[in-house]
A protein has these predicted regions:
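Conserved substrate/cofactor phosphate-moiety recognition/catalytic segment
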Residues: 18-71
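Conserved phosphate-donor/acceptor-positioning beta-strand/loop module used by diverse small-molecule
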Residues: 101-122
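Hydrophobic anchor at the beta1->P-loop junction of P-loop NTPases
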Residues: 8
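The conserved Walker
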Residues: 11-12
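Small-molecule kinase domains that catalyze NTP-dependent phosphoryl transfer to phosphate-bearing small molecules
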Residues: 127-178
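Glycine-rich phosphate-binding loop used to anchor ATP phosphates in small-molecule kinases
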Residues: 58-102
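C-terminal accessory "lid"/substrate-recognition subdomains
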Residues: 182-193
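Conserved glycine(s) of the Walker
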Residues: 15
Length: 193
């Protein structure tokens, strides 16, 4: 019996969190690990400890602690809901944190067109309390993510990068992807009778 780890890949406002919440409802014995929650917690309660530039060590450390705890002390499936757009970052997650001999590793790539994303950020009511540094809007975050496409490490996931890859191009793909993942959970980690 293997646990599933579902890792989202996509830009801001591509639907990762909405997808993760819907998946959690349908996938018994799972939880969402979303770094936006850690960012908001740190900005609310420990703002003075938040680094203003460079690596976000505090947020990543808190996230790692939560994931390690879930791995060692629960039998929950993990839904890792972050942008995960860095090829090296995904490689680390898939090979170091969630090795193939212990987990069924699933990538869900949100390939939503940029015009849709810009429309969504324009209408967004989400809290900006997850930001650090000079960001004041999700439009700025999306613009930065566009610029990062020029870096060789920011690439779309490919087949064989994980055990399974699902691509969501629009909201119509969400339900069928959730059903496929739930089916995989039943196949690889059946509930004890």
């Amino acid at each position: 019996m293997k646990r599933l780890v579902i890792i989202t890949v996509g830009k801001t406002h591509s639907g990762k969190t909405t997808f993760a919440k819907e998946l959690e409802k349908e996938l018994p014995n799972s939880f969402i690990m979303d770094q936006d929650n850690q960012a908001e917690f740190i900005n609310t309660h420990y703002e003075k400890l938040q680094p203003t530039e460079g690596s976000n060590i505090l947020k990543h450390g808190l996230s790692k602690f939560i994931v390690d705890y879930a791995k060692e002390h629960t039998n929950l499936h993990l839904i890792i809901c972050n942008s995960n757009r860095s090829k090296n970052g995904r490689f680390y997650l898939l090979n170091e944190v969630f090795p193939q001999n212990e987990y069924i590793r699933i990538l869900v790539h949100f390939a939503i067109p940029d015009d849709v994303l810009y429309e969504r950020v324009g209408l967004s009511k989400r809290s900006t309390n997850i930001f650090r540094g000079n960001y004041s809007s999700f439009k700025e975050v999306l613009h930065r993510q566009q610029v990062k496409l020029l870096h060789e490490d920011v690439v779309d996931p490919i087949e064989n990068g994980a055990d399974y890859l699902f691509v969501i191009r629009n909201s119509k793909d969400v339900n069928s992807t959730i059903l496929k993942i739930v089916h995989l959970a039943k196949e690889f980690s059946p509930t004890p009778k």
